[in-house]
């Protein structure tokens, strides 16, 4: 059995209150995590609730993922973690998903898939395209960088999350 794969959503602005943009992004990624049996890790969001309480609160404000039911089910299965930076080593090998990979850390989807079968990995996505100190530190400390387009094409965060999770899930 392959180790768990973590989808990590990072809010680069730790002082920013939880907002509708965050809510929509989390609502969009939760059905993907549910469908592919991935864990969801929310980093640097101002969330004080337990994962289950947070999921229940979110469910009332979304129609995505069967009205938030997928998010609640992930939480009940222990597949949602709410944490802060720096990232915990127990998330596994860090893979930054970016259209601007460092050439020395750049990997292709097939190699990331192969790694995911042997080791726990964390696919890191930023909530926005800003590269502040928090994101620069993550880029520097990451084990690998993944440009899912393999062409340096910048995608919206939700499109990138969908592409990365689907491609990694469907490779063999």
Could you tell me what each predicted segment is?
Residues 53-62, 110, 134-139:
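Short, aromatic/basic amphipathic alpha-helical patches
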Residues 22-28, 106-110, 161:
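Well-ordered, non-membrane alpha-helical segments in soluble/globular domains
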Residues 2-99, 169:
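RNA substrate-binding interface of SAM-dependent RNA methyltransferases
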Residues 98-138:
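Long, charge-patterned amphipathic alpha-helical coiled-coil/hairpin "stalk" segments used as oligomerization
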Residues 37, 91-92, 119, 139-142:
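Short, well-ordered alpha-helix to beta-strand connector turns
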Residues 133-172:
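Structured adenosyl-cofactor binding patch, chiefly the S-adenosyl-L-methionine
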Residues 13-16, 47-50, 101-104, 128-132, ...:
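Short acidic, S/G/P-rich loop/turn micro-motifs used as interaction or catalytic elements
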Residues 1-4, 112-113, 117-118, 172:
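Short, Lys/Arg-enriched, disordered terminal segments
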């Amino acid at each position: 059995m392959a180790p768990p794969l973590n989808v990590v959503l990072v809010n680069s602005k730790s002082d920013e209150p939880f907002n509708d943009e965050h809510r929509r992004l989390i609502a969009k990624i939760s059905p993907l995590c549910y469908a592919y049996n991935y864990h969801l890790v929310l980093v640097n969001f101002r969330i004080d609730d337990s994962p289950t309480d947070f999921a229940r609160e979110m469910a009332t404000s979304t129609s995505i993922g069967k009205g938030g039911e997928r998010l609640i089910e992930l939480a009940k299965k222990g597949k949602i973690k709410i944490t802060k930076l720096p990232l915990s080593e127990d998330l596994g090998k860090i893979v930054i998903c970016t259209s601007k990979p460092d050439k020395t850390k750049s990997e292709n989807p097939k190699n990331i898939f192969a790694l995911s079968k042997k080791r726990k990995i964390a696919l890191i996505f930023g909530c926005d395209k800003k590269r502040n100190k928090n994101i620069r530190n993550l880029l520097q400390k990451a084990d690998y960088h993944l440009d899912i387009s393999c062409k340096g094409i910048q995608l919206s965060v939700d499109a990138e999350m969908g592409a990365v999770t689907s491609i990694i899930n469907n490779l063999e």
